[in-house]
C-alpha cells in the first residue's frame, strides 16, 4: 500500500495518525520515503478490516 492510499482512506495525515495511535510527523515521513513501514501496513490492514492490504500477505502473522 502507498502512503497516499492510507491518507486518502482516513482523510488526512492527522486522521491517519489518530487512527493508528501515532504522531502526524510519522505519517509525513511515509510520504517523504514513499512507503509505509511493514509493521504499520499490518496495523492498517487490521484497522481498515482488510480494505487496505499489506504488500506482503504471505508474511502475515496469525491472529
Range-by-range predicted roles:
Residues 17, 28, 45:
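Alpha-helical and His/Cys-centered functional microenvironments
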Residues 1-15, 19, 49-59:
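A short, Lys/Arg-rich alpha-helix, primarily the initiator
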Residues 36-55:
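DNA major-groove recognition helix of helix-turn-helix/homeodomain DNA-binding modules
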Residues 22-35:
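Recognition helix of helix-turn-helix/homeodomain-like DNA-binding domains
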Amino acid at each position: 500500500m502507498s502512503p497516499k492510499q492510507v491518507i486518502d482512506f482516513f482523510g488526512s495525515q492527522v486522521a491517519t495518525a489518530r487512527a493508528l495511535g501515532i504522531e502526524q510527523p510519522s505519517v509525513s515521513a511515509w510520504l517523504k520515503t514513499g512507503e509505509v513501514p511493514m509493521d504499520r501496513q499490518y496495523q492498517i490492514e487490521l484497522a481498515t478490516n482488510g480494505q487496505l492490504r499489506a504488500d506482503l500477505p504471505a508474511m502475515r502473522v496469525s491472529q
